Amino acid sequence: MAHVVGYDSLNEASNGYIGVEDLNAPLGALQMGACPTPFQSMLLGDGVPQEVAVWKLGPKGARRSGVHQIDPAGRRAWLPGQDCIWKQHGVWEIGSNGEARLLRPDYFAVLDGQAVDFNRRYLRPFVNRFAGAIRSVEPEALIFVESVPPKALPEWGGEDAGKIVSAAHWYDGIVLTLKTFMPWLGVDVSTLRLVVGPWAVRRSFARQIRQLQQEAFQKMGGAPTLIGEFGIPFDLKEKYAYRSGD
């Protein structure tokens, strides 16, 4: 197909819990609203009520603003008679006092006594296998790679597949999260700090996009960058367009 230049390997390849060093700590820097820790998520999935932290985006980034009680009312993610899979694997247990207890906070961070690097151990080999499969049919196809913003791209070397392109995603973080356009307010996605003033916002946007290009060039053997996703939500201003037709 002459009109197809290449194929994306995996959209925003997420590590999930892989590499998380403490299952009882907040998961990542981007926290908004009620955010259970990974351990609390396991307990909620097992029907156990949890008091979870509530986060808000402030001038200096995300900050904890309160707590919220989430009660699944006994509803579980598992079939009747089946334990939580992570409980079966010894990640947590119900103690003699009837309380849940985290046994292995680093369960997803260590494998065979070694620290787990998601990009090196899983994503990079996957992309190489994907590239091999695609090029067995289309030898000249480009292969697009991206991570979950703002996480790093995988390191790429001469032994890896060639003709790789970074398909990093970029959005105006304020528009994406608050669903309203404010040209005088932005957010630096690498630090989650607010940027104030229209010129400062535009400079911040340019710097963020330049950083995406530089990271790909430095970490992926001179790979070019094609922004793989950008745009605005359709439901701005409380879905005004759906109501007005404008």
State each model region's role.
Residues M1-Y240:
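Active-site region of glycoside hydrolase catalytic domains
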Residues D246:
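Extended, alpha-helix-rich binding/interface surfaces that flank or overlap catalytic cores
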